[in-house]
Amino acid sequence: MLHKKWWKVLSFILLLYTCTYGFLVKVPKLDDRMQESIRNFFFHVPMWFGMMILLFVSLVYSIKYLRSNSLVHDVYAQAYAAMGLIFGVLGIITGALWANYQWGSPWVGDPKQNGAAIALLIYFAYFVLRGSLVDAEKKARLSAVYNIFSFFMLFPTLWILPRLTESLHPGGQGSDGNPGINGKDMSANMRTVFYPAVIGWTLLGVWISTLKIRVQMIQLKKEGLL
């Protein structure tokens, strides 16, 4: 039984490691204001990585649904999209807390903040669409198409348009090119926490998604749709 749960155990261990060593590891002092707040990097950025991975899985299942018309695939797509959206909201919240300390306000209209907000609103519309439809087959079909559209909208809103202008985010000024992550600012010590954090948070998202899937599958069986 344990061999089937190894990844859940791994998620727990990695997050325990992140939440302990992440506050103990030596971090670089980039400026007088950043100081210890840079530890939020172990929580804020992995949320966005986890979101992208979970939404990609949701995309795959939406494509599978359009090929198979199986409501099982729709259940998977919806569950992973929901968890991805939650990770995105957590990314916004942790970013706002960091911005309030670093920039003096939780929301300063930074291009990356605005792009992230637009991306999340697009995915919120996915769930509004699902809630507005009654017929299960029609809901699954239209949702799958919209989910595919939503995923590809992540690229201009998160990765392309915000990088065409300067940002208050690290590396977003001058000739650095406004990268998604400024690798120069992440020390070797930080990497020992950051990468496990990405894996740990993502596995947690998958774990919660599987629980949601089990509940939805039971509901569909009760309704006679499976």
Regions found by a protein language model. Name each.
Residues 1-226:
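Polytopic transmembrane helical bundles with strong interfacial aromatic enrichment
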